[in-house]
Amino acid sequence: MGRLFGTDGVRGLANEKLTAPLAMRLGAAAARVLTEKKSTDRRPTAIIGRDPRVSGEMLTAALSAGLASQGVDVLDVGVLPTPAVAFLTDDYGSDMGVMVSASHNPMPDNGIKFFAIGGRKLEDWIEDEIEQEMGKLPEEGPTGAAIGRVFDQSHSALDRYLHHLQQAVHTRLDGIKVVVDCAHGAAYQAAPMAYEAAGAEVVAVSNKPNGYNINDGVGSTHIDQLQKAVVEHGADLGLAHDGDADRCLAVDAQGNVVDGDQIMAVLALSMKDGGELKRNTLVATVMSNLGLKLAMERNGITLRQTQVGDRYVVEDLRAGDYSLGGEQSGHIVIPEHGTTGDGLLTGLFLMARMATTGKTLAELASAMQVLPQTLINVPVSNKAAIAGDARVKQAIAKAEEELGETGRVLLRPSGTEELFRVMVEAADSATARKIAGQLAAVVAEV
C-alpha cells in the first residue's frame, strides 16, 4: 500500500477508500502523535469541522470517536470553511484541528486534513508518524473519566470566525455589489455574512447545500455560472469559492475571469504600496503564469516559486518570513491573518483594494498580462511511471525546443487524484493548445 497522505491530507471515495473504520484509526493515531508532546496537564482538545457533503457526518463521527478514545475532548464546529477550522484551532488554544472535506472534488469523494497546534498544516514527517502509529494502535485506551467527550461548538464558532475576518480587513465596502458563488459548500453561510458585514451588497448563489450538490456545476471549478450571474445582476465583481472555501477566484464586471495569479498581483502591489510586502517578495508555485513573474519584475517585486500545493507555499512563507503567497487556483495565504489559504479573507482584501483605489477589478487586474496557458488533466493508472518514461521525456524535449524562450512546459502528477497534469504556456493560444494536446496524447499512451 502506498502513502496514505497526499498533498492535502487523505482523500478518496467515501466509504470505499475513505471508510469510517479508517477515519476512526486516523483520529486515534493523530491524537497520539499530535498530543504526545503536550506541555500541560490540561486534557487535550481537538477542533473538528466539515463541509456539507453527505459523508461528512459519518466521517466526523468516526474521527471524533477515534480522538475521544485517546482521551481528547472534541469541539465540533459543524459546517465551516477549512481556514475557519485552522483559525479556531489557534483561537481556542486547541492541540490539533481536523477538517473533513474533499475541497473541490465531486460529492462522492471526501477527505481528512489535520492541523497542528496553532492551526498549522502538518509537515510530511508528522504525517508519516501518524501513518506509522496507525499500525501499532493498542487495543485498549483510557477508561472512565479519562475518555474524551464531544462538544457542539457550531454556533459560537461561526461568530468567532466572522469576528476574525472583520478584525483583519477594516476597509468598508459600501457601494460595491458582489455576487458570491458558495459552491453549495462550507462557506454557504460565512461568505455572504462576511461580505455583508463589511458593507457590500451581496447576491449569494449556490448557497443551498443539501449534502449532494456540493461543487455540482458550481463554485470555483465551474466559474461560467458566476460569469453569467455577474453580468445579469450588474455587479461590480463576482467571487467563487470551492467546497471548503480555502480558495477564491474572481470575475470582473464584464464577466472576465480573474484567477489566483492576477489576484496575487493585485494584492502584492497593494501591500507594496502600503509598505506591508516583506522584502518585496511574493511566493507562488511553478504552476503560476509566466505573466505573474514579468509583472512582479516590472514593479520591483521578487517572485519565489515552490512545488505545487499551498502547504509548500506556506512553508516557504514561514521560512522566509514573507507576507503573501498563493496559487493560480486561488489559494491565497496572508500569514499575518491566517495559517492557510482563506477564500473569504482573499475576497475581502480584493474588494478593499477596489474600495481604496476607486478602480474596477478589470483595471486592477490589468497590472498583469496573462500569457496563454493550456492545462490538460490526463487520467492515468500509474502516475509514478510517467515522469521516467522515455517517450514522455522525448516529447517534452521536442516541445521545449519548439517553444524556446517564448513559453514553458510543466508536467506533474496530481497529489489528490489519479491524474497527470500537462501545462503549456506559449505566445499564443493555438500553440499552447497544440503542444499541450501532443504531450497529453503521449502521457495517455504510457
UniProtKB/Swiss-Prot annotation:
Q: List the Pfam families hit by this protein, alphabetically.
A: PGM_PMM_I (PF02878), PGM_PMM_II (PF02879), PGM_PMM_III (PF02880), PGM_PMM_IV (PF00408)
Q: Where is the active site?
A: S103 (phosphoserine intermediate)
What cofactors does the UniProt entry give for this protein?
Answer: Mg(2+)
Residues the entry annotates as binding Mg(2+): S103, D242, D244, D246
Give the enzyme's main class according to its UniProt record, as a single word: isomerase
EC no.?
A: 5.4.2.10
Keywords for the protein's UniProt record, in alphabetical order: Isomerase, Magnesium, Metal-binding, Phosphoprotein
Query: What Gene3D superfamilies does UniProt report for this protein, alphabetically?
Result: Alpha-D-Glucose-1,6-Bisphosphate, subunit A, domain 3 (3.40.120.10), Alpha-D-phosphohexomutase, C-terminal domain (3.30.310.50)
Q: Name one GO cellular component term.
A: cytosol
Isomerase as a keyword?
Answer: yes
Coiled-coil spans in chain: none
What Gene Ontology molecular-function terms does this entry list? magnesium ion binding; phosphoglucosamine mutase activity; phosphomannomutase activity
- The highest taxon in the source lineage is Bacteria
Q: Which reaction does it catalyse?
A: alpha-D-glucosamine 1-phosphate = D-glucosamine 6-phosphate
Query: Which Gene Ontology BP annotations are present?
Result: carbohydrate metabolic process; peptidoglycan biosynthetic process; UDP-N-acetylglucosamine biosynthetic process
> What does the cofactor field's note say?
Binds 1 Mg(2+) ion per subunit.
Where does the record place the modification Phosphoserine? S103
Q: Does this UniProt record's set of keywords contain Magnesium?
A: yes
Describe how it is modified after translation.
Answer: Activated by phosphorylation.
Concerning PROSITE patterns, the annotation shows: PGM_PMM
Q: Which family does it belong to?
A: Belongs to the phosphohexose mutase family.
> Function, please?
Catalyzes the conversion of glucosamine-6-phosphate to glucosamine-1-phosphate.
Q: What is this protein called?
A: Phosphoglucosamine mutase
| Organism name | Corynebacterium urealyticum (strain ATCC 43042 / DSM 7109)
Organism taxonomic ancestry: Bacteria, Bacillati, Actinomycetota, Actinomycetes, Mycobacteriales
